[in-house]
């Protein structure tokens, strides 16, 4: 390459850097300092602050140790699958760390007694039971903009009824009104949520699309906007019952990470939700321990470091409940092997892994 060509390339690079500096200074003058920066210049930008879901397995499956703050989360599934329970457990975990939490109860169905059993501090939980969808989303926007709330739950998107629908007649057809309401609200909320580092969890219900020949006919309410804006989407399903003799004492639950902007998606985890107790932590220790090879299973017997935990899963759970020090030791070992466990979750997942189950549940 000739000297003239080299000089031309150098001049161009100098011109580009000068033009970039001028553009950056103009943006900062117009919109304030910090309105634009190099991503690596602020180390805090890279770090992701999380809140535990109350389930060790789900925290591992999410890839970052919990649900991310400053993001929109969607939890959806059929009725009585554990959506509100999972949201309340996340609130309880945030409160344990001193977080301020709010619950927008659009369904008017929150049970304070059950919330207390899950570990929620009712004295410090902000609750609103709005009359209309507009009111619910305006309250959500105000709380997020305050910058003082750490976790905010909206239960549920399906119950966010537009004012026009409430004031209208019982048979009026107002197509797309709820979807437009959600789309506008999320456009307003998304920047505030990021700046305030507040996690907003939307609980959603599922509906059936009519005339679908191929693929799953299931869809969520409130249009497509929430699917795009959510950083994490969790599909929660009841897959069986937990019994003590003949009495049903809980649900076997499967959660699939359908969307995850923070880590690889499509991982799924199974755990027990016990009535009046929430996620069974001891049950998770047994199941995850076996999956990671930390807890040995020989026939019906479970053992850890040559110490027998019990014959049968329920007896092993009871033993760990009565020996919290041993349970903590197993939990620590599981957290150290989180990467191995997450890989095994992914082997059972995949975008189409649940099609058969979804069809079976319809």
Curated annotation (Swiss-Prot):
PROSITE patterns: RECA_1, RECA_2, RECA_3
Location(s), subcellular: Cytoplasm
Residues holding ATP: 77-84
One annotated Gene Ontology cellular component of this protein: cytosol
InterPro entries membership: AAA+_ATPase (IPR003593), DNA_recomb/repair_RecA (IPR013765), DNA_recomb/repair_RecA_CS (IPR020584), P-loop_NTPase (IPR027417), RecA-like_C (IPR049261), RecA-like_N (IPR049428), RecA_ATP-bd (IPR020588), RecA_C_sf (IPR023400)
GO molecular function, a single term: damaged DNA binding
Keywords, sorted A to Z: ATP-binding, Cytoplasm, DNA damage, DNA recombination, DNA repair, DNA-binding, Nucleotide-binding, SOS response
GO BP, one annotated term: DNA repair
Pfam family, one: RecA_C
Family: Belongs to the RecA family.
HAMAP family membership: RecA
Known function: Can catalyze the hydrolysis of ATP in the presence of single-stranded DNA, the ATP-dependent uptake of single-stranded DNA by duplex DNA, and the ATP-dependent hybridization of homologous single-stranded DNAs. It interacts with LexA causing its activation and leading to its autocatalytic cleavage.
Name of this chain's protein: Protein RecA
Organism: Rhizobium etli (strain ATCC 51251 / DSM 11541 / JCM 21823 / NBRC 15573 / CFN 42)
């Amino acid at each position: 390459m000739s000297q003239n060509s080299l000089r031309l390339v150098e001049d161009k690079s100098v011109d580009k850097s000068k033009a970039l500096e001028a553009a950056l200074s103009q943006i900062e003058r117009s919109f304030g300092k910090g309105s634009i920066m190099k991503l690596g210049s602020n180390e805090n930008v890279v770090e992701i602050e999380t809140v535990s879901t109350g389930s060790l397995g789900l925290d591992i499956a999410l890839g970052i140790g919990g649900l991310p703050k400053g993001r929109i989360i969607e939890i959806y599934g059929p009725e009585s699958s554990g959506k509100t329970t999972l949201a309340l457990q996340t609130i309880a975990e945030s409160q344990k760390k001193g977080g301020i939490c709010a619950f927008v109860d659009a369904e008017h169905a929150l049970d304070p007694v059950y919330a207390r059993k899950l570990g929620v501090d009712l004295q410090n939980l902000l609750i609103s039971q709005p009359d209309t969808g507009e009111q619910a989303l305006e309250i959500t926007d105000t709380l997020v903009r305050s910058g003082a709330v750490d976790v905010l739950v909206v239960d549920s998107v399906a119950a966010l009824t537009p004012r026009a629908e409430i004031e209208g007649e019982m048979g009026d057809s107002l197509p797309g009104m709820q979807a437009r309401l959600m789309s506008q609200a999320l456009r307003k909320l998304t920047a505030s949520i990021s700046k305030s580092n507040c996690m907003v969890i939307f609980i959603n219900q599922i509906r059936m699309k009519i005339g679908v020949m191929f693929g799953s006919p299931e869809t969520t309410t409130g249009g497509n906007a929430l699917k795009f804006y959510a950083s994490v989407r969790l599909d929660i399903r009841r897959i069986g019952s937990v019994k003590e003799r003949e009495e049903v004492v809980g649900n076997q639950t499967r959660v699939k990470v359908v969307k995850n902007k923070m880590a690889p998606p499509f991982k799924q985890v199974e755990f027990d939700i016990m009535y009046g107790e929430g996620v069974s932590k001891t049950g998770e220790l047994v199941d995850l321990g076996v999956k990671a090879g930390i807890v040995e299973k020989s026939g019906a017997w479970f053992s850890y470091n040559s110490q027998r935990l019990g014959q049968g899963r329920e007896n092993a759970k009871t033993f760990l409940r009565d020996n919290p020090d041993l349970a903590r030791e197993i939990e620590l070992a599981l957290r150290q092997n989180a990467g191995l466990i997450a890989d095994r979750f992914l082997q059972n997942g995949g975008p189409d892994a649940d099609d058969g189950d979804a069809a079976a549940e319809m």
